[in-house]
Amino acid sequence: TAVDPDAVLELLSDEYARRVIDALSDRPASAPTLRNALSASRATIYRRLNELEAAGLVETAVAVDPDGHHRKRYHLVVDELHLRLGDNGIEVAPGE
């Protein structure tokens, strides 16, 4: 999975993004579930999920709930990141 180093570093400095990552590290979740668990606004949760997905840290899958509704569930793509300082600046790569 390719990650965007600048986006990852910016997201890791954001409290809500870190809280979303922490919640998703336990198990995949829908945006409404994250919103309730983190006591954040709908806009905040969706913004962070979109940013995390664009950065290559989160992906979505559609799941069917027991009541028949289709719901997007978000899950972490990586469980470990490596930072390296080199001649080309800061590099961020998924762990192996």
Feature map (PLM): residue ranges:
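Short alpha-helical segments that sit at the start of domains
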Residues: 1-18
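Short capping segments at the starts of secondary-structure elements
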Residues: 15-17, 26-30
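A short acidic, leucine-rich amphipathic alpha-helix
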Residues: 20, 33-39, 52
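Short coil turns linking two alpha-helices in DNA-binding domains
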Residues: 27, 41-46
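DNA major-groove recognition helix of helix-turn-helix
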Residues: 49
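Glycine-centered, phosphate/nucleic-acid-interacting loop/turn motifs that mediate DNA/RNA or nucleotide
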Residues: 56
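Short beta-strand "wing" residues that participate in macromolecule-binding interfaces
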Residues: 60
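Conserved segment of winged-helix/HTH DNA-binding domains
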Residues: 66-96
